[in-house]
Amino acid sequence: MNQKKYSFQDLLSIMQRLRAADGCPWDRKQTHESIKKHVVEEAYELVEAIDSGDNQKIADESGDVLLQVVFHAQIAAEEGGYDIDDVTDAICRKMIHRHPHLFGTANEPADWDEIKRKDRSQATVAEEMRGVSAALPALMRAEKILRKAEKAGYAAPQTEDFSMDELGLGALLFRVADQCRKHHIDPELALSRYLNHYITEFEEKENRQDET
């Protein structure tokens, strides 16, 4: 199988071959549970590629994310759950539903949050907050919850004193996430970039010590 340029259909065929009875032993034994961590890992590698501004890296990492979608769809299809066409159908329907001014009869852009709340039968802001995935990184989840609270007219608590226990330090991180949101800064990205800065400074310090 050697072509000048492969298509999405080729990717589906490759995954089916890998999962076949005489396919790759590692790929054959994987389950939704065993590979779910790779979805997160590949998504973050895509973010890193986007930050680099390198289009080839972005394309490569986008492919890795796409592979995870195809992998899960193949596993589900074998179990009689859903297939890749169901995935495509679901996202197409969702995008059409959430843009009625483009694909329906509405004249004004719809409120995405309002549509999602209705879709998920969320009657209150608290229910909407609980709808924010608990699997998200905590700072990202905090930012999303704070945004929903602000939209509903609620301000974040402005506690100045923080106890040095889990709940108190959690409140401190929550406050940091709120400040990031107010200044339009992604808290996860801010910490990630600071870590890169810290590693660079640490490396320079090590190099200076080696020279003495």
Walk through the language-model features, giving the residues of each.
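Flexible "arm" and connector segments at domain edges
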Residues: 1-61, 67-212
